[in-house]
Design a protein with these regions (language model features):
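Accessory, usually C-terminal, subdomains that scaffold auxiliary metal cofactors
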Residues: 108-169
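Short capping segments at the starts of secondary-structure elements
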Residues: 1, 85-88
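Long, low-complexity intrinsically disordered regions
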Residues: 77, 81, 101-110
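Positively charged, polyanion-binding regions of nucleic-acid-associated proteins
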Residues: 56-60, 64-86
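Alpha-helix boundary/N-cap detector
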Residues: 19-22, 26, 64, 68, ...
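DNA-recognition alpha helix
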Residues: 89-103
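Eukaryotic partner-binding/assembly regions in large regulatory complexes
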Residues: 1-56
Length: 169
C-alpha cells in the first residue's frame, strides 16, 4: 500500500481511536514519517521480532525524525549513563531545555507548559520502551539491543543513534 492509502485506511478504521479527525490525521502522518526512515530489514524486525526489539526500533525512528528528542538522548540520557548517574531528574530536563532555548529562537519562544508536556512525553516514551524503569524515579535501564540490530545500524552509518541508546559503547 502507498502512504496515502495507509493513511486513508487508518483514518477510515479509526485505528488510533482519537476523537477528532485532525488528531487522527496528525498521528497517521507522524507514524508514516517514522516508518519512512526504516529500511526493509528494520521494518521486518519491527514486525517479526520481540516487543523489546520493536520498541527499540521505535525509539530509533523517533530519534531519526525528531531532532530535539535525538539531542536529549545524546546529551542527557547517554551522558547520564556514561557518568554512572542512573536517574533522570527534573533538573536534567530543565537544564537541557534551557540550553536548547539558548541555541534556538524557536525553542526560546516556547512557554513553560510546552517544556512540561515535552518532559512528560519523553518520560512516557522512555518508560514504554523500557529505557527507564519507572516514571517517577526514572532510573535508566540500559536496553539489550540484539547484535543483529547493532551491526545493521553500524553498517548503514547510524551508529550515532546506537550510541545515544547504549551510552556510547
Amino acid at each position: 500500500l502507498s502512504k496515502s492509502k495507509l493513511k486513508e485506511k487508518a483514518l477510515e478504521k479509526n485505528i488510533f481511536q482519537y476523537k477528532t479527525e485532525n488528531r487522527n490525521k496528525e498521528i497517521a502522518s507522524v507514524i508514516l514519517k517514522r516508518l519512512g526512515v526504516l529500511d526493509d530489514f528494520l521494518i521486518d524486525k519491527l514486525i517479526h521480532d520481540s516487543i523489546d526489539t520493536s520498541k527499540q526500533i521505535a525509539i530509533y525512528s523517533i530519534m531519526k525524525t525528531d531532532r530535539l528528542f535525538f539531542e536529549f538522548m545524546k546529551e542527557v540520557y547517554r551522558e547520564k549513563y556514561i557518568m554512572v548517574d542512573p536517574f533522570l531528574s527534573d533538573k536534567d530536563f530543565s537544564i537541557f531545555f534551557q540550553h536548547k532555548s539558548e541555541q534556538s529562537e524557536r525553542v526560546a519562544k516556547w512557554v513553560d507548559y510546552t517544556y512540561y508536556k515535552l518532559k512528560q512525553v519523553y518520560i512516557r516514551i522512555l518508560f514504554e520502551a523500557y529505557f527507564i524503569k519507572d516514571q517517577d524515579k526514572r532510573e535508566i535501564n540500559k536496553p539489550l539491543i540484539s547484535s543483529e540490530i547493532e551491526d545493521h545500524l553500524i553498517n548503514i552509518g547510524d551508529e550515532v543513534y546506537l550510541e545515544a541508546m547504549l551510552g556510547g559503547e
